[in-house]
Amino acid sequence: ADKLYKLGYKNVVVYAGGLPEWKKQSLPTTAGAKKVDTVKKEQKPEFSKNGAKLGKDEGSIDGEWLKALIIDNKVPEYIQIVNVLPAKEFKKGNIKGSINIETDKLSAKEIVSKLPKNKTIIFNCSAGARSIEAWMKLKKDGIDVSEIFYFDANINCKDNNCKIEVNEPLE
């Protein structure tokens, strides 16, 4: 306090608890300082409206969640897995219960017309890239993709026996 008087300050007050106690009470340490309210980041939902567990990347499904369902043969009825590969590749092996719609040469509207209605759609391919492309094609064309997702994974199937390695999220 004496130093402040020597510097010319006139209205000097001493807080008995000292600075550590002052800070503990979350009180400002300068006249201009105001407590900053932290802005909460918008919470991303964990599940889709129908109950599919969402991945970290936009449009993705949680890969480990879906992999476990596929391996345990417990993919829910509300989910339709859509293999986007050419029919020739699909016939070599695919995820049990999946259907094949080769999306590469189709427009977004043509893809949607072939998708089952009232289902959560999950696109898959052999490495993730073509399923992402199919999803992006729909999104770019303004299609509602709130229940359409992609499975970002390396998938190698012989008949219905599949080895699945989930790719790391980009986020």
What are these regions (language model features)?
Residues C125:
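Short cysteine clusters
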Residues A1-E77, A87-T120, A129-E171:
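Rhodanese-like catalytic fold shared by cysteine-dependent sulfurtransferases
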